[in-house]
Curated annotation (Swiss-Prot):
FU repeats lie at residues 630-680, 683-730, 734-777, 779-824, 832-879, 882-927, 929-979, 982-1028, 1032-1077, 1079-1121, 1125-1168, 1177-1221, 1225-1272, 1274-1318, 1320-1363, 1365-1411, 1415-1461, 1465-1510, 1514-1559, 1563-1610, 1614-1659, 1665-1712. The keyword Transcription does not apply. Residues 1838-1860 are annotated as: AC 2. The chain crosses the membrane at residues 1744-1764. This is Proprotein convertase subtilisin/kexin type 5. The lineage of its organism: Eukaryota, Metazoa, Chordata, Craniata, Vertebrata. Its EC number is 3.4.21.-.
Length: 1860
């Protein structure tokens, strides 16, 4: 049946058929994308800018993406975590930000581990060593037949086991605790990207799903010889793991993984990729591609990271690994698999990008790979290409150990040259034109480990890689079914461009775009100019996609080594595999060639020929031999290659064996290696490194490997810098910038911090939590410091920061005096003394710097405090003070002076001891390595440096004696030892605990006593009934009746004498109470029994009754308790229960009887009210008049008339004390147990008196303690007076206060008094000398005469700070002491070598000044001097002046001081009357002025003008500081008033007010913020912009709170109160996942508030049955009716949290008085209402004038614009927000074409990226761009999209780029 007959259905079925067919075709194509709430963003400007933008649009900046600079990981908590629709909301306007260059919402990518599970039932776990069974690593005796293996043992025999090489497995984690992996595990090569931590341990489950990474790791680096399981190929390599497959795999996750620690990791092994389902086309997204590029360019210090990839397991699905962008990349080494037999495994894919192969499994019966497995086990069932890639990684590790300098391309070249076909079975083996045998199944063949290490040993780096892009014609060609399209392109290899010229090929990439109705029907081939044909794509049966290929890159390595130039032939075949619509043929739209390779032959002779040993010598110097011009016939230089030399000398080589080096005279010589400052370039040339590099791998500044002196290598950028960046320190030994500890902001060593990151404080050299002085933080709490430490950072004497009195801080330890090369620092700026290190040039010194030396090292001379290089003397000589060599003293081998104390080294026969050469070390030192070393300070003599190496002891530095015991000197001898006169501890006599000598014991051990005759210890033997006294060595009698007793207590018997009974460790003549005798012991009675025997109890304790030999509290039915007898007696036979034995004492009756007045009678005997039944008279008789009813007798009342109450069967008118009249029961009832007098059950009037347990009456009840809000007084709880919450003693003696009040000295007040602060509701006194504080230990302002520094008040500011408005402010970095913050405010310089001039610290005095030693400052010379030596002595004069004998410069020596020399009419002329000295007759030619006048430039004035002040020292008008309008001195802190635009704070003028102040425009001053504010915009508590410590900012109100109000939570990182999610009533953090309780219409479920109704509805009504009604139209979701109950707003609105109202963002053109709107400039995460601030009434008149003038100017400009617009003709319609199509795209394109530029960051093969033109930030013009289909759009910067406009912008691209 044809196509038409099958598809054309009649009628309505026609449409259904078409839809069914479309669905079937599109289903595989339209896979649902899953968008996450994570974004990748590229932002220029660093972390601060990224954080600002993230906060503005509601994102959280997780941090930089791996090693990708300027790429950040953003997370948005208020968007859906996983959605099939990309996120659209106000946060999407982040793309409009000028600094945002590119943004991409992350999409979940499916990645499959490339192992294959045959059958879980067949897996067997073994714990035995598996080496004999590891067939793929060696041929054992039981392996038959043994095929050619990978020669791994051969590499081992050559000494290579992977040592110092680091391999990381990118997978689902590795089990780092596995016994086979523990030894080689490398934490620096490991992290958990899925879990965002550093531990790569896999997630365990019942199925062991995450075993893959552990198996791969074992193949690489399982430890050898540990008797556990297997052996890794590189069993001495370091192994790490990156856990990244056990979660959502996104572009960011992959990029972070492949770029993890690239300077530490050498090889990355990955055994995963896109689905091997035969229909997927997928590869690295932009971030991962960038990470690959960065890895090969900068990883391994520029040598390039090595990426090893498994080729794929899609063989059964007819997959082709060219559709996998990871294995198809030039940056990865794609590894395939072969079975043991050499046959193709059934899972193997074919493709032209596979480089080589290793062993793995084949058929189910074939052997598989043995490796480590989860739960510390092993497996022999590892399969697939997953097993092959780690093998390759292990072999490459062996090669890198053999030659660590192999580049990433060198590794691929070595694999190409050493892999071999061997026994591998494939029908497509071919030999290319370069002589390499290659296959689509196995690449260049099976890897050979031994051959690789041998090749690596002699390898020379290949020339630089060239990239040639050959763009073919763009003519579209139609691909017909069952036919082929051929396109031929003649390539030149870019021969016209020497920087891109490719002659010898490596990788060849075809970049191709094809449209096709069924992608799986295509097959693509490429034929090289040499005739090598590569299959780039084979038919794929399951690929039904209609997408074709869009800029997809196919790669082949089959042309490796061939020439690039010539005809390249591309063939595209269309072979229909099933029926399809032939009306839509495929089209080859465009293709291009990208050729990678070198311009010269990549292999040097060293690589081509066997290595031979040759003698080398340096050839860097110029040749000095004078060669003649005749032909040279002698031997050539050893560095010439085998082609020899042609004269005239032996070094004139025809070709070099190793490298060419070009000398300064332009001649070339051959050298064995390039000299320092050069690198091995292409063509065997030595090229120069960048100027600062000592060694390098390229000529650029970011390709350094080591640096010249004075520079440090930044390991992250491979550049040489003079100063290391923040977060790193200078390693001066290795000239490196190394990273600081994670807590340091700056440091001098890894753990030696100098500045800490936020939230931590510097404790010595460590950053940790702050503790009070004398304590340190140990990670959990604050612990006391060592006794030497005043403050410390850790335990022990080495943890001191400052030392106690009598000790000095020296290099982190406390010493009693400064060591050699240290000096005592007199500054003591913090009150503690310290020893500072002398300058490196000094041996000893008395101060800092190189000018304070007091002695010098050997070979240097002391000159004016500086050590200068002396003469160079021979051994046995030294340099004397005149610089001459003199002979050392005879005992020295080398010395630094003439005496025997000046030795520096000794002869072999002598020992060096602190400058002396001695025959034996002094007694308090020991010899080690021919030097005397001091003993431990506790030893007098010793054999080593430790405290356990003493041989004798004496007194320590404090005069305390020490005693030797087992090599240690202790304060005293241990127990059982005594001290000899030689301070040695010897043992006491036997059984002696304390003694004076070996013969005299003073205390014996237990059980012994001192014999008075010989003072020895004799065993104490006590008689019967005696025991040893524990305090005295004697026998004491036991307690009476004891036969034996306890050593510790003679009263504790262990046995009793005859006639005594034992009970409770005592002996009794008769058994005590509550016991009875039984044989020789007393037995205790039962509980509550007073007397008993073995048969039972006789009587009971009070409150209990005897019943059948037992004691009971209640007797039970038929019995009552007889109080007198203490027994249970029987009731009357008629009673069920009773209170006595009588017939009328029943309380309940037997069945059939009725209770009547205490009697049980038959119903016939019931009486009338007021009468009772008389049994004797057998008739009714009247009750007593007081009874209402009675029983048995007239006076035994059972109820009473009204007004009377029943009490003990009598009626009383009032109840006695302890009872109360109950109207309900008509009887007197007992008060509660603790109550003495009451008027009701809970209406106590007086409590009982209980000695030792007082009770207090409160609101009718008795309490042992008065409740909160009351206090005890005379047995009554009285109420505290308001506003006390608790009080004591009296109503006003408060202990705590109600809300809104604070407690101060027992009184509740609204505010604390001055110099107090409220802490937890109690007023605490501020610290000493503190005027105002925010915490009891944190001062805010000091009292007069004191200054604030580090939150405390000091009498003076420490060095490096100056006093300003009672605050200590840091000086400029150049100043040691200063008077202000500027560089010209110094009073003392930081460096002692610097000089001071006009407050500036300079290296030397400037011209026109002289150095004054007394003040150590540079002073100005006289105006007439050009240079001078003092204030009145010129050394040279200004032009036109001459010097007189006194050193003064004058016009003419004949003229008087008030005259000048006239050159025109020679002679002396008088100065102007206003001048004292002058240069001419005019009044503006003065040099000095008379008294009461001041020199202003060259004019004398009475008063200085504005901007100047009178300098009385120089009698002139000097410039004020640039910030001052008027002043009293030159410094910035001597202003009287400020220039416009500056604000005055005290006497200082500032452009921006300091922290804690705000600028008041009306007064031009900096005014103090409210005490709770850190930064503010006004004086009120609601003007805060940031808060001080202990406060949190409520941004919506501008207030600082000690604790956040309801509906807010504390965000510690920003010190703010953040609003809970709109659905949360209370919460513990940001977002919808941290709720603690919910608002109405929501219920809590797992921290999330879930709506009770559908979206857009709210709940109405209580209980389980309720209704739901629609939300207000402005809300998307809500909690109630109306516009002010919203919980979620539409995309164009922002939720105002305080009133749950959805509002628009304010337009910049809206007037402040317009309707309510949100200020979205800073953030769209929360609505902050725009406020219109009222200007102060006191504003200057000039401000009002300015506003008026501005308004007039705006009106004039507005009028001009209107006139201009009218002249333009037709009015343009108002532009809608968003994008609109331009009318004529063809016309527009040319005008905007110049506005575009191509991306240089990513190749646009998978994702189309749109970029805007470059615009200035203030340019509001339309932005134009072109879409994929060529349509030109105009984009507007401001506003939101209308619903109608959105459709015009729909496109599928997931990334966007912007260049602003």
């Amino acid at each position: 049946m044809g196509w038409g007959s099958r598809c054309c259905c009649p009628g309505r079925l026609d449409l259904l058929c078409v839809l069914a067919l479309l669905g079937g075709c599109l289903l595989p194509v339209c896979r649902t994308r899953v968008y996450t709430n994570h974004w990748a963003v590229k932002i220029a400007g660093g972390f601060p800018e990224a954080n600002r933008i993230a906060s503005k649009y509601g994102f959280i900046n997780i941090g930089q993406i791996g090693a990708l600079k300027d790429y950040y990981h953003f997370y948005h908590s208020r968007t859906i975590k996983r959605s099939v629709i990309s996120s659209r909301g106000t946060h999407s306007f982040i793309s409009m930000e000028p600094k945002v260059e590119w943004i991409q919402q992350q999409v979940v990518k499916k990645r499959t581990k490339r192992d294959y599970d045959f059958s879980r039932a067949q897996s067997t776990y073994f714990n035995d060593p598996k080496w004999p069974s590891m067939w793929y690593m060696h041929c054992s005796d039981n392996t038959h037949p043994c095929q050619s293996d990978m020669n791994i043992e051969g590499a081992w025999k050559r000494g290579y086991t992977g040592k110092n090489i680091v391999v990381t497995i990118l997978d689902d984690g590795i089990e780092r605790t596995h016994p086979d992996l523990m030894q080689n595990y490398d934490a620096l090569a490991s992290c958990d990207v899925n879990g965002n931590d550093l531990d790569p341990m896999p997630r365990y489950d019942a199925s062991n799903e995450n075993k893959h990474g552990t198996r791969c790791a074992g193949e690489v680096a399982a430890a050898a010889n540990n008797s556990h399981c297997t052996v890794g190929i590189a069993f001495n390599a370091k192994i790490g793991g990156v856990r990244m497959l056990d979660g959502d795999v996104t572009d960011m996750v992959e990029a972070k993984s492949v770029s993890f620690n690239p300077q530490h990791v050498h090889i990355y092994s990955a055994s995963w990729g896109p689905d091997d389902d035969g229909k997927t086309v997928d590869g690295p997204a932009p971030l991962t591609r960038q990470a690959f590029e960065n890895g090969v360019r900068m990883g391994r210090r520029g040598l390039g990271s090595v990426f090893v990839w498994a080729s794929g397991n899609g063989g059964r699905s007819k997959d082709h690994c060219s559709c996998d962008g990871y294995t198809n990349s030039i940056y990865t080494i794609s590894i395939s698999s072969t079975a043991e037999s050499g046959k193709k495994p059934w899972y193997l894919e074919e493709c032209s990008s596979t480089l080589a192969t290793t062993y793995s499994s084949g058929e189910s019966y074939d052997k598989k790979i043995i490796t480590t497995d989860l739960r510390q086990r092993c497996t022999d069932n590892h399969t697939g290409t997953s097993a092959s890639a780690p093998m390759a990684a292990g072999i490459i590790a062996l090669a890198l150990e053999a030659n660590p300098f192999l580049t990433w391309r060198d590794v691929q070249h070595v694999i190409v040259r050493t892999s071999r076909a061997g026994h591998l079975n494939a029908n497509d083996w071919k030999t290319n034109a370069a002589g390499f045998k290659v296959s689509h199944l196995y690449g260049f063949g099976l890897m050979d480990a031994e051959a690789m290490v041998m090749e690596a040993e002699k390898w020379t780096t290949v020339p630089r890689q060239h990239v040639c892009v050959e763009s073919t014609d763009r003519q579209i060609k139609t691909i017909r079914p069952n036919s082929a399209v051929r396109s031929i392109y003649k390539a030149s290899g870019c021969s016209d461009n020497p920087n891109r010229h490719v002659n010898y090929l490596e990788h060849v990439v075809v970049r191709i775009t094809i449209t096709h109705p069924r992608r799986g029907d295509l097959a693509i081939y490429l034929t090289s100019p040499s005739g090598t044909r590569s299959q780039l794509l084979a038919n794929r049966l399951f690929d039904h996609s209609m997408e074709g290929f869009k800029n997809w890159e196919f790669m082949t390595i089959h042309c490796w080594g061939e020439r690039a130039a010539g005809d390249w032939v591309l063939e595209v075949y269309d072979t229909p595999s099933q029926l399809r619509n032939f009306k839509t043929p495929g089209k080859l739209k465009e293709w291009s060639l990208v050729l990678y390779g070198t311009s010269v032959q990549p292999y040097s002779p060293t690589n081509e020929f066997p290595k031979v040993e040759r003698f080398r010598y340096s050839r860097v110097e110029d040749p000095t031999d004078d060669y003649g011009t005749e032909d040279y016939a002698g031997p050539c230089d050893p560095e010439c290659s085998e082609v020899g030399c042609d004269g005239p000398g032996p070094d004139h080589c025809n070709d070099c064996l190793h490298y060419y080096y070009k000398l300064k005279n332009n001649t070339r010589i051959c050298v064995s290696s390039c000299p320092p400052g050069h690198y091995h370039a292409d063509k065997k040339r030595c090229r120069k490194c960048a100027p600062n590099c000592e060694s390098c791998f390229g000529s650029h500044g970011d390709q350094c490997m080591s640096c010249k002196y004075g520079y440090f290598l930044n390991e992250e950028t491979n550049s040489c810098v003079t100063h290391c960046p923040d977060g790193s320190y200078q390693d001066t030994k290795k000239n490196l910038c190394r990273k600081c500890s994670e807590n340091c902001k700056t440091c001098t060593e890894f753990h030696n911090c100098t500045e800490c990151r936020d939230g931590l404080s510097l404790q010595g050299s460590r950053c940790s939590v702050s503790c009070e002085d004398g304590r340190y933080f140990n990670g959990q709490d604050c612990q006391p410091c060592h006794r030497f430490c005043a403050t410390c950072a850790g335990a022990g004497a080495d943890g001191c920061i400052n030392c106690t009195e009598g000790y000095f801080m020296e290099d982190g330890r406390c010493v009693q005096s400064c060591s050699i090369s240290y000096y005592f620092d007199h500054s003591s700026e913090n009150g503690y003394k310290s020893c500072k290190k002398c300058d490196i040039s000094c041996l000893t010194c008395n101060g800092p710097g190189f000018k304070n030396c007091t002695s010098c090292p050997s070979g240097y001379l002391l000159d004016l405090g500086m050590c200068q290089m002396g003469a160079i003397c021979k051994d046995g000589e030294y340099v004397d003070e005149h610089g001459h060599c003199q002979t050392c003293e005879a005992s020295c081998a080398k010395c630094q002076g003439p005496t025997q104390e000046d030795c520096t080294t000794c002869p072999m026969t002598r020992i060096f001891d602190d400058g002396r050469c001695v025959s034996n070390c002094p007694s308090w030192k020991f010899e080690f390595e021919n030097q005397c070393h001091p003993c431990h300070h506790t030893c007098q003599r010793c054999q080593g440096s430790g405290p356990t190496h003493c041989t004798s002891c004496g007194a320590d530095n404090y005069g305390r004696e020490h005693f030797l015991y087992q090599g240690e000197c202790g304060d005293s001898c241990p127990e059982g030892h005594y001290a000899t006169e030689g301070n040695t501890c010897l043992p006491c006599p036997d059984n002696c605990e304390l003694c004076h000598s070996v013969h005299v014991c003073t205390r014996c051990m237990k059980g012994y006593f001192i014999a008075p005759t010989n003072h020895t210890c004799q065993k104490l033997e006590c008689g019967q009934g005696e025991v040893q006294d524990p305090d005295y060595e004697e026998c004491v009698p036991c307690e009476e009746g004891c036969l034996g007793c306890s050593l510790d207590d003679p009263g504790t018997c262990t046995s009793c004498a005859m006639g005594y009974y034992r009970f409770d460790h005592h002996c009794y003549k008769t058994c005590p109470e509550k016991t009875y005798s039984e044989e020789v012991e007393c037995k205790a009675c039962d509980s509550n029994c007073g007397s008993c025997d073995q048969n039972g109890c006789y009587w009971c304790e009070e409150g209990f009754f005897l019943l059948g030999g037992s004691c009971v509290r209640k007797c039970g039915p038929g019995f009552y308790g007889d109080q007198e007898m203490g027994e249970c007696e029987s009731c009357h036979r008629a009673c069920e229960t009773c209170t006595g034995p009588g017939h009328d004492e029943c309380s309940s009756c037997q069945e059939g009887l009725q209770l009547l007045r205490g009697m049980c009678v038959h119903a016939t005997k019931t009486q009338e009210e007021g009468k009772f039944w008389n049994d004797i008279l057998r008739k009714l008789q009247p009750c007593h008049s007081s009874c209402k009813t009675c029983n048995g007798s007239a006076t035994l009342c059972t109820s009473c008339p009204k007004g009377a109450y029943l009490l003990a069967q009598a009626c009383v008118s009032s109840c006695p004390q302890g009872t109360w009249p109950s109207v309900r029961s008509g009887s007197c009832e007992n008060c509660t147990e603790a109550c003495a007098i009451c008027s009701g059950a809970d209406l106590c009037k007086k409590c009982q008196m209980q000695p030792g347990h007082p009770l207090f009456l409160h609101e009718g009840r008795c309490y042992s303690k008065c409740p909160e809000g009351s206090y005890a007084e005379d047995g009554i709880c009285e109420r505290c007076s308001s506003p006390c919450r608790t009080c004591e003693g009296n109503a006003t003696n408060c202990h705590s206060c109600e809300g809104g009040h604070v407690l101060h000295h027992g009184v509740c007040q609204e505010n604390c008094p001055e110099r107090h602060v409220a802490v937890k509701g109690v007023c605490k006194h501020c610290p000493e000398m503190c005027q105002d504080c925010i915490h009891e230990k944190t001062c805010k302002e000091c009292t007069p005469e004191f200054f604030l520094h580090d939150d405390m008040c000091h009498q003076s500011c420490p060095r490096g700070f100056y006093a300003d408005s009672r605050h200590c402010v840091p000086c400029h970095k150049d100043c040691l002491e200063c008077s202000g913050p500027k560089a010209d405010d110094c009073e003392l310089c930081l460096e002692s070598s610097w000089v001071l001039y006009d407050g500036l610290c300079l290296e030397e005095c400037p011209a026109g000044t002289y150095y004054e030693k007394e003040t150590k400052e540079c002073r100005d010379c006289h105006k007439s001097c050009l240079t001078c030596s003092s204030s009145g002595t010129c050394t040279t004069c200004q032009k036109g002046l001459i010097m007189n004998p006194r050193g003064s410069c004058m016009a003419n020596e004949k003229c008087s001081p008030s005259e000048y020399w006239d050159e025109d009419a020679p002679g002396c002329k008088p100065c102007h009357v206003k001048c004292f000295h002058c240069m001419g007759p005019a009044e503006d030619q003065c040099q000095t002025c008379p008294m009461n006048s001041l020199l202003l430039n060259t004019t004398c004035v009475k008063d200085c003008p504005e901007g100047y002040y009178a300098d009385e020292d120089s009698n002139r008008c000097a410039h004020c500081h640039s910030s001052c309008r008027t002043c009293e001195g030159r410094h910035s802190r001597q202003c009287h008033s400020c220039r416009p635009g500056w604000f005055q704070l005290g006497k200082e003028c500032l452009l921006q007010c300091r922290e804690g102040y705000y600028a008041d425009n009306s007064t031009g001053r900096c005014e103090r913020c409210n005490r709770s504010c850190k930064g503010c915009q006004g004086p009120r508590p609601t003007d805060c912009l940031s808060c001080d410590r202990f406060f949190f900012l409520l941004r919506s109100k501008g207030e600082c709170h000690r604790s956040c109000p309801d509906h807010y939570y504390v965000e510690q990182s920003t010190q703010t109160c953040e609003r809970c999610h709109p659905t949360c009533d209370q919460c513990k953090g940001k977002g919808a996942l941290n709720c603690l309780s919910c608002v109405w219409s929501y219920h809590l479920m797992g921290g999330i508030c879930t709506s009770d109704c559908l979206v857009g509805e709210y709940r109405v009504g209580e209980g389980e049955k309720f209704n739901c009604e629609k939300c207000h139209e402005s809300c998307m979701e809500c909690k109630g009716p109306g516009a002010k109950n919203c919980t979620l707003c539409p995309a164009n609105l922002v939720l105002h949290m305080d009133d749950s109202h959805c509002l628009h963002c304010c337009n910049t053109s809206d007037p402040p008085s317009a309707q309510e709107c949100c200020d979205c400039q800073d953030t769209t995460d929360e609505c902050i209402l725009r406020t219109s601030k009222v200007r102060p009434a006191t504003e200057h008149f000039k401000t009002a004038l300015f506003i008026t003038s501005s308004m007039m100017l705006v009106l004039l400009l507005g009028a001009a614009v209107v006139v201009w617009k009218k002249s333009r003709g037709r009015v343009q319609p108002a532009a809608k927000a968003g994008y609109e199509k331009l009318a004529d795209p063809n016309k527009s394109y040319s005008s905007y074409k110049s506005s575009y530029r191509e991306s240089t960051s990513f190749e646009e093969d998978q994702v189309i990226e749109y970029r805007d033109r470059d615009y200035d930030e203030d340019d509001d013009d339309d932005i134009v761009y072109m879409g994929q289909d060529g349509t030109v759009y105009r984009k507007f910067k401001y506003g939101l999209l209308d619903d109608d406009d959105i459709d015009e912008l729909e496109y599928d691209d997931e990334s966007y780029s912007y260049y602003q």
